[in-house]
Amino acid sequence: MNTGVIWFRNALRLNDNRVLVECLNSTNSQTILPLYILDKSDLEQNNNENRIKFLYESLIDLDANFKAKFGSNLIVLNGKSRDIFRKLLDSDLLDLSEIFTDYSNKPDDIENENNLKSILAENVSVKLHLISKVNSLTNVQEVVSQENFKPPKTMKDMEKLFSNLYPKDEDGFYSIDEPLDIPENSKPIYDNSSEIIKDYLFDAKKELS
């Protein structure tokens, strides 16, 4: 069966998560593989102790919620994302059909995406879906690509930008999208992944103990 990867990056939650919704609604994959990838050496070099602790606690919480909802664990991996996806794509045990993740303009995320796109150029049957409006209210790509777009510098600029995107209700509030519920539909979790990526498995609970 074809498998779709849910690559959690910046939205470590189940509710209001378009990446999760899009993957579960896709007809191109019958099983899912939920991943979070970190590089511990980079993480420790570029973040303080409190930020790292918060990330680990968030991963533990997401894992508990994922298990309660879908009956399986979030898979947390330590390593370079390009190496991990290469391992997944090269495995004969996995029929990977698509990868879902959130759109991001963070330099590290863009670099990881470009590395992944280079790998996928050799595996054209696997599609990468960058889902917008996960970490922002707007589709950033669409907004900045508009012909007359100028980066907002003041609150008045922000108000003008939002006025062009969202109508106001009778009380003068912007009518933005409602938060997405945790999907009721589900797919089986691909359960042979540990054999493929066992060298990268990471235990956030152990790191906090």
How would you label these PLM feature ranges?
Residues 147-209:
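Glycine/tryptophan-enriched, flexible segments
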Residues 75-91, 118:
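Structural beta-alpha unit
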Residues 38-43, 80-81, 104-106, 131-138:
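Short beta-alpha junction loops
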Residues 109-118:
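Short Gly/Thr/Asp-enriched flexible loops that form oxyanion-binding sites at enzyme active sites
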Residues 135-149:
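Glycine-rich, charge-decorated loop segments at or immediately adjacent to ligand/cofactor-binding or catalytic sites
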Residues 33, 73-77, 127-131:
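General small-molecule cofactor/ligand-binding pocket signal
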Residues 95-109:
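Acidic beta-strand-to-loop metal/phosphate-binding motif
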Residues 1-71:
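N-terminal beta-strand-loop-alpha-helix module at the start
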